[in-house]
């Protein structure tokens, strides 16, 4: 499956945008008429007895992902795709498809869509797009809402802090030598990657 080709295919994109947010049962009925849609039609083997629920979930997440860049000019999307050589095109498409397919929540697809939009607008580069989407894929979405609490150095050290730190969104402002000896002190503060994600989340 190629999310870039789906984005560029008028038939596929229209199908995803129109039907991707439907409930499974309704979607399964509509899909019976989708055999002429190039990429989505091939994803769902229509000869199967039942629609694969995971594939349905992928199309649903793809809907929320694409919604975020719907208002971006086609020229910007073309410019982004044309900037990729064959190797990077395959690598980035494979990673983005995997991250989107394995995302556990629709909200993650929405946030990945916002990250992709930032890339199309030239606000971040390819590697930062992949880094941020990878963080979103692995994170518990509600934890990301707590990033604002670390704009200023925060001594709080709980499971949310641990999660955000492990995802590379916080930096530890180390304690003084005496405090390290006593195993106390130290404050967490959002780093550059975390600030980028915060900004994108606000959009």
Q: Which residues does each predicted region cover?
A:
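Membrane-inserting effector segments that mediate pore formation, membrane fusion
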Residues: 4-64
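Acidic-enriched, low-complexity/disordered segments with a strong bias for Aspartate over Glutamate
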Residues: 12, 29, 35-36, 55, ...
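The feature marks long, low-complexity, polar/acidic/proline-rich intrinsically disordered regions embedded
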Residues: 16, 47-61, 73, 81-84, ...
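Membrane-proximal, non-transmembrane interface segments of integral membrane proteins
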Residues: 55-124
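Long, helix-rich, hydrophobic modules that act as membrane-proximal anchors or helical bundle/coiled-coil regulators
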Residues: 94-203
């Amino acid at each position: 499956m190629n999310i870039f080709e789906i984005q560029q295919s008028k038939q596929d994109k229209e199908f995803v945008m129109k039907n991707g947010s439907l409930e499974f049962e309704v979607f399964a009925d509509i899909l019976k008429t989708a055999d002429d849609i190039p990429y989505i039609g091939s994803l769902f083997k229509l000869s199967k007895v039942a629609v694969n629920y995971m594939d349905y979930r992928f199309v649903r997440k793809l809907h929320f992902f694409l919604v975020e860049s719907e208002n971006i000019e086609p020229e910007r999307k073309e410019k982004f795709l044309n900037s990729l050589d064959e190797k990077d095109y395959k690598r980035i498409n494979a990673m983005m498809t995997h991250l989107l397919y394995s995302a556990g929540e629709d909200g993650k697809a929405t946030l990945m869509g916002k990250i992709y939009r930032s890339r199309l607008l030239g606000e971040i580069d390819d590697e930062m797009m992949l880094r941020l989407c990878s963080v979103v894929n692995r994170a518990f979405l509600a934890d990301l809402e707590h990033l604002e609490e670390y704009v200023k150095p925060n001594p709080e050290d709980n499971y949310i802090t641990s999660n955000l730190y492990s995802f590379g969104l916080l930096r530890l402002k180390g304690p003084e030598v005496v405090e390290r000896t006593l195993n106390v002190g130290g404050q967490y503060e959002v780093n550059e990657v975390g600030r980028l994600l915060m900004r994108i989340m606000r959009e």
